[in-house]
Amino acid sequence: MNLAGKVAIVTGASRGVGAATAVALAEAGCAVACAARATDATPLPTPGTLDDTVRRITDAGGTAVAIPTNLAADDEVRAMVATTVERLGPVDVLVNNAAITFPGDLELPMKRFDLVFDVDLRAPVIATQAVVPGMIERGSGAIVNVSSAAALNYYPGQMAYGMAKAALEHLTMSLAAQLRPHGIPVNTFRIDVPVASEGFVAALADIDHSDWEPPEVAAEGILWVLRQPAAVTGRQFGMARLRADAGIMESRSARPHTQAPGMVTASHLDTPPPAR
């Protein structure tokens, strides 16, 4: 997809990978709707707000709007899409990036379990339901679901998060099959190397982050996926594989990715991306 002149929604755009992706899309010529909870008026403990992201974009001459959204609330997710259409125009690109997690496996209270699934899985489904009719009508569009190595591996205390990400990757596969006849690609971008987003740095403050990727590296990968032909759909693109096969994201160069403490690995299911 040629991103110039397109309208994009990025969830979780107040900080980290979401903010970096919103900025990168604006630099590519998109008008960007930035959605999340944190604003200047209603900040969260972790640094970063929607207003920060929008200022970065508009100060550089781009177009962006902040759409405060509680992604655990169905009506607010639908309103996010409706507001984007009202303020920027029909949605061409949806990046389902927002995610939350809580520590705990089987002992995790169901209220928190449900909240993880509401934000990490249900919100992407509802947002997709809201944007797809317009994409089908126009015969174009693209959706990227941002996943994690937790979809394929067990990290102690992250059972619900891993389950939600695994389901999100299945959503990609299912949507790709349904939307292929309409020329609308749906792909997964899997973050499978450490990224120094504000949230993870705060949560893992005792770990050395010096060789972690900056969020901008993940954003570069997401835009690479969006720029592929519409025939490239239903794929799971991992950051590590894209670095090796697509020649992007070189900040860690040839340094091997070290396995996180306590991680139990599963077989890697990525397929190689197409030639550029």
Please place each PLM-identified region on the residue numbering.
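Catalytic Tyr-X3-Lys loop
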Residues: 99-100, 109-126, 140, 144, ...
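Active-site helix of classical SDR
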Residues: 128, 164
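C-terminal helical subdomain
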Residues: 181, 188-189, 205-275
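Conserved glycine-rich Rossmann-like NAD(P)H-binding loop of the short-chain dehydrogenase/reductase
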Residues: 28-50
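Alpha-helical segment proximal to the catalytic Tyr-Lys
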Residues: 133, 177-178
